[in-house]
Amino acid sequence: MKIALIAHDQKKEEMVAFATAYAPVLANHELYATGTTGLRIQEATGLPVHRFQSGPYGGDQEIGAMIARNEMDLVIFFRDPLTAQPHEPDISALMRLCDVYAVPLATNIGTAELLIRALERGDLAWRSIVRGQTKGGEESKTER
């Protein structure tokens, strides 16, 4: 599964702690992140992370583009609800795309833990069907 990890500045430490705690689960998946968040996760866990631009420089939009192409399976986005963000429209668009494409989205550690446990149990395997793939990973003949 492809997992996006995003954290606002005030939530980066929390994201690093989360990624460290769940590194054994995350190691089985393809990780994507915005710039600094991805670097901090890589340094703390040693896990490979595909890094996009920083959020205010288009990173949220790059992840949003993957969602719109149905290439992202799970988004964990630790938002700071108490600080105004200059790229708030991008954040809203990202969250809207998760709703449009039925991509599970966690915006706090409580929900993130529920989703990561579900991922660990295989409860999110339905995402491969939504992506038009069979169990073996090849594309379905009915895919657009």
Swiss-Prot record:
Keyword Lyase (UniProt): yes
SMART domains: MGS (SM00851)
Catalytic activity: dihydroxyacetone phosphate = methylglyoxal + phosphate
InterPro entries noted in UniProt: Methylgl_synth, Methylglyoxal_synth_AS, MGS-like_dom, MGS-like_dom_sf
Positions of the MGS-like domain: 1-144
Keywords annotated in UniProt: Lyase
GO biological process, one term: methylglyoxal biosynthetic process
Disulfide-bond pairs as recorded: none
A Pfam family it matches: MGS
Enzyme active site: 60 (proton donor/acceptor)
Enzyme Commission number(s): 4.2.3.3
GO cellular component: cytosol
One MF annotation (Gene Ontology) recorded for this entry: methylglyoxal synthase activity
Gene3D superfamilies: Methylglyoxal synthase-like domain
Binding annotation for substrate: 8, 12, 34-37, 54-55, 87
Biological role stated in the UniProt entry: Catalyzes the formation of methylglyoxal from dihydroxyacetone phosphate.
Family membership: Belongs to the methylglyoxal synthase family.
Record's protein name: Methylglyoxal synthase
Organism: Geobacillus kaustophilus (strain HTA426)
